[in-house]
Amino acid sequence: MRKPQFDYLKCQRQILVDMHVPDWDPGFLANFDPIRMVDLYQKAGLQAVMHYCNSHMGLCYWPCTVGEMNKVLKGRDIVGETVAELHRRGMASCAYYSCIFNNWAWTHHPEWRLVPAGAVGEGSTGSRYGTCCFNSEGYNEFMHQQIDEVTKKYEFDAIFFDMVYWPRICVCDNCKRRFRQESGAELPGKVEWTDPLWCKFANSRERWLNESFKKITATVRQNAAIPIFNNASPHPITWLWGNNVEELREQDLLGGDFRLIDMFSGFQLFAGVSKSTVVYMNAFTGYIGAGSCVISPEDQFVENALYSLAFNSPFMAIDAIESNGNVSAKFYEEDLRKVFDKMKPYEGLLGVGGKPIADVGIYFSDASRMALFENGLSLSDEDLNDVLPPTSPHITGWVGANRALRINQVPIVTITKLQLKELSKFRVIILPQVVRMSDEEIEAFKNYVRDGGKLYASGATSLLTMDGTRKGNNFGLAEVFGCSLEGIDYHRVAYVHPQIDQLKEAITPRSVVAHGAPRHSPPHPTKITTRIRPVADTQVLATLDLPYSEEPGSREDHKFSSIHASPPWRITNDPVIIRHRYGKGEVVYSSVDLECDQAPTLGGDPDMGHPDYGPSLLFVAIIKSLLGDAPVTFSLDADIGVFAVAYDDSQNHRLQLNIANIPPLPPSRPVPLVKVALCAPAGKKIKALKELPEGSPMLFTVDSQGVARTEVRDLKHLCVIAAEYA
């Protein structure tokens, strides 16, 4: 088995050059020269290059024996030339292979095609993209033969597989046949998360994808001991695309463009799941996607590369070959070089410390990337297939919780079912609308609270099993929550009315916070509020207020109490937030998913422009009350655009705190003062603080609780603090 010449996992500065170019015009790629490209890579200061073996066109860039080579190359092996020249100049080679997006295969083998339910989207008539199905044995054989050939022939240092997901629900004969063989039933025609048959199909799609990628990785590992990864970007968006953490764990590292979701949230998820590191890939310039993407070097560094540095990760810029094979030399020689020169001093910190550490874990659930309002939708419904931005309450709640706690400087990480045996590491765990839960998850969270953990849960968390409705139509965690479910109500707007001083003070000068749309227009989606019956020893923290009418109201029907809004009118005693002791721990359960109601990062209602962080303030106050008064791993007193990521670099007996200044909008300006507090691991004491990478000593004090305090002045982009402990 061939070993790599270069350690790809230690390559900080990388690039991907898109080359999805057809061959029906002899002018295409006429000016492309792999030797000239490697010369530009070297001038940019790159350490690794991801280059194409094929593209979404399905045409290969090496003389393949299976499939078809791009004919404008006239047999020139640009894959082989690129690998050899990269290695000669001291750079790593990462192969790119497009999986199910393959126009050549779609055209020549109709029986391999992915058939979207309703024939919409990629793969339908008139689309530029031809997609094939992972359940097609013929296509799998074709794909594995190509992968086997290319990994035997060339000495890659890593390989990346793009488009490992289901872009639509496939109803091809291959999928129908496989589901019939496995379940004895036909494919369901509509979504129904309470129906065992639908759940079996949804679960099967994920399993099929996992099995397909395992076969791909097995093919590579027969030939080369190199890192393998795919495009992880689709994972946190929707159940429809079929990815899950089992598939992510098959990979040696994780990569993708995380701008499909909140950047910080995406990094948190992937950093917690990855076996090694996370490669953030983002378009810098060139014809990417729908149009030309151009961004200045300074903004590129702040908005993209700086996130990578904050998470001790590589950054991969994305350029695109122009159709004639040209690129901008200035981009490589000047613009890209400026970005990478700023990164280079931190090269030695790549991958240091393992996974981020924190006091609060926000739970991400593959199974809950759905929504109850999807029940009854046909598989071709546009409301189902229009997945961006994500509409799942769990996803919006997970992002909202990350955003609210990040800007309030609460130490957080994202956790998944892979960490179910490690829950005791966290003082507080957040379950944002985790609607579908397995028996293993139910038991793990019960034990966590029973043994002293603190839990926040919202909405329909634990209502459904992986196979449908839970017995008794009640929460699986009802005993832990301290309440039973009476029903689910849908409100255009509801109001949370705090009943204890701590929460009243958190939202002052407000007396209530709105859940949903307090104004008459424009229309907003309805919000779910669970009706609950608390047990006797449960404390009610907040109750429900409702507007004059559930309907929008008009001049004619008089169903409103104020022309501009729908303010509280019906004051109830119905509990919406409760606190309950369970074993040695406690739970705050909220009928409304406060974490989903976060105001945008930029501030303000997108329609009116006036910020209201009421739900965010209430949510943060609840989490801080669960944390209690004991010192946290770290805390900052800083602007909204400043955040920190902490690592326990136990090999060097030090905590590493990466403090980044990424404002909501460019330009980035230095922050005059950031106050920092750091707490050593249990049983340890902080002995010294140093600023990395130079190792300059920092002045600090230590209080009676062992918390080290220091200050960072004029934070421009990044400050890395090493807290040595013993």
List each language-model region with its residue ranges.
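N-terminal small/glycine-rich loop or linker at the start of catalytic domains
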Residues: 6-24, 119-127, 275-289
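Short, solvent-exposed turn/loop segments enriched in Gly/Ser/Thr/Pro and often Arg
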Residues: 18-20, 50-59, 97-104, 160-171, ...
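Active-site-adjacent "subsite" loops/lids of carbohydrate-active enzymes
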Residues: 95-154, 187-202, 400
